[in-house]
Amino acid sequence: MSSEDLQDHHEIGNEVIKKKGVYTKKKCQDCFFLILFLLFWAGMIVVAAFGVKNGKPDRIVKGTDQYGNICGVNNIEQGILNETQARDTTNEPYVYFIYYPDLIGINYRVICIEECPNSTYTDLNDPNQLICDYGTVPATNQISPNGTCMGKIKSKLIFNRCIPDVTNTSVVLNSIVDEIYQFVNNQLTSDLSVEILTDLTNSWRYLIYGALIAMGLGLTWIFLLRFFAGFITWLTVFAAYACLGLLTAQVYFQWQDSKDAYENTIPSQRLVMQEKNILALKVIFIILCVVCGIFALILLALFSRIRIAIRIIKECSRAIGIMPSIFFFPIFIFLLLCGFTVYWVYIGVYLATAGSPTYDDQYRFTGYEADSKLQKIQIYHFFGYLWTFAFILALNQTTIAGAISSWYWVQDKKDTPFFPVWSSFFRVIRYHLGSIALGSLILAIVQFIRWVLRFLEKKFKGKEAYLARFIVRCLNCIFGCFERFIKFLDKNAYIMVSIYGYSFCQGAKRGFQLVLTNILRVAAVNLVSSFLMFLGRVFITAATVGISLYLLKEHENLSFYIIPVILIGFIAFAISTGFMSVYDMSIDTMLLCFCEDCERNDGSPERPYYMSKSLRKFVDGKGRSKCC
């Protein structure tokens, strides 16, 4: 920083102190990026309108007949199919397979019916035991050779489809059942992304339950940490590890149970989704075992330093105790994140089913094909999620930083501004949204590049493109490190922006200089406190996922229930991040304020320090009078 910039910076700092911790001569910064963000969201609204207009989630949820009619709706009014194919199936909500033998084996027709048959035919000469295609009347004493009429088979309802439920039947009938199971497997795996989104839609209540559980655990953790910092910190360490161990054991036993059930099923009647669930549980179990081992090593390495981190947490608790509304701010952030995620998934389901229907050579529905225009729209929608999610988290970080800094920069802490959290929030809304938009945009771009690299790595998998796969993995590793650096830079920039009203680039520059100058002094605090906050996230996430896994494993309408559980895990981690960010951001803000305090003041009566004695003693290590 040049001497002229440093002089301007000191003048701004003195203004902060005069105004009881709040710099009042702020102005809007980075306005261009705020306008860009608003224009991008105008595009998101257009994308949502396109998805709602063209998407048909019922195609997957309710199923279709071989003509493309959605079961359980009036397809004539929807006007998707031509007049000769469209049919009103309002009173026919279930998919049924009319099977019949032909020259190449077993063939089938697909229709919508009122209810699944509850018994298997015994006499094909009885018209009441036959089921026919649309417009065909069962003929007495005969069945149709082309499959328009065949005998009923007792069926059970799976994913809105009538699947034969037969035992001790003839070889021919078992062959028919095998064919239908194969058809269901093909249909359910024809577009796995659509099926996953459908499962998320069917389990929306459990997603909300999981979010509420995570929110309750987060509020409890923060409230107790305020009054019992030392006890809760140690409890968090052991509880997080215990929950992780219990979750590992639960996943192991559920993996074994699922594998046993799969092996006891007739091979021809095994669903692909069962196998995918077993594989997913096995992979998750192995990952959890590795994570448990890593956590054990980290705990051994940081055991003595955890006591030091407790002191800084207590100092943050002093600041938070003066502003109790800070406990409720994560709820506001949670509502924003939850509402936006629900909106994004909802529109995503519509976009995933907005493609053109595809059919086989007998004009039976097989899936959907997205053209290049739809693919670009889906990419736009995905990037919007990354940018907006980062924007909301940045809003939380900047608000917390502004509230804590307004407490730090007053000699008498009773002079802290009234309602510091919400005052800081309104300052952010008024002056700093452009800076937040820029910081979150940079982070979203890096995250998007990493997702593209993951896609390329998956595309090269199984092919003899070893060099390309190696390059992609290296790039993914590099951008992973770069993403962590951007998050670090963003956080420091938001702190300086909230204190002095800098633009994003100015704040990032000044924040990085402060950390670089005091790197040895603050590194240990940052490392230990960040690890403790991460343990809090693990505790909340592991407990939430464990409860959700128990609730969802018995859900009948989910074909791949691990996906909702994983999403609940992400939601719980995001919610816990919002809660932990209160202490995490408080610690980082205090450290940067401390460095600023050291640079500007020397402890003399004319230029006294603003830090508390306990904080100064902790950071200085030996309680020396010299600050830096």
UniProtKB/Swiss-Prot annotation:
GO biological process, one term: ethanolamine transport
Location of this chain's protein in the cell: Cell membrane; Mitochondrion outer membrane
GO MF terms, alphabetically ordered: antiporter activity; choline transmembrane transporter activity; ethanolamine transmembrane transporter activity; transmembrane transporter activity
Pfam families per record: Choline_transpo (PF04515)
Membrane topology: Multi-pass membrane protein
Spans through the membrane: 32-52, 205-225, 227-247, 283-303, 320-340, 382-402, 433-453, 531-551, 560-580
Keyword match Protease: no
Major localization listed first in the record, in broad terms: membrane
Job of this protein: Choline/H+ antiporter, mainly in mitochodria. Also acts as a low-affinity ethanolamine/H+ antiporter, regulating the supply of extracellular ethanolamine (Etn) for the CDP-Etn pathway, redistribute intracellular Etn and balance the CDP-Cho and CDP-Etn arms of the Kennedy pathway.
Protein name according to UniProt: Choline transporter-like protein 2
Source organism (scientific name): Dictyostelium discoideum (Social amoeba)
Taxonomic lineage from the root: Eukaryota, Amoebozoa, Evosea, Eumycetozoa, Dictyostelia
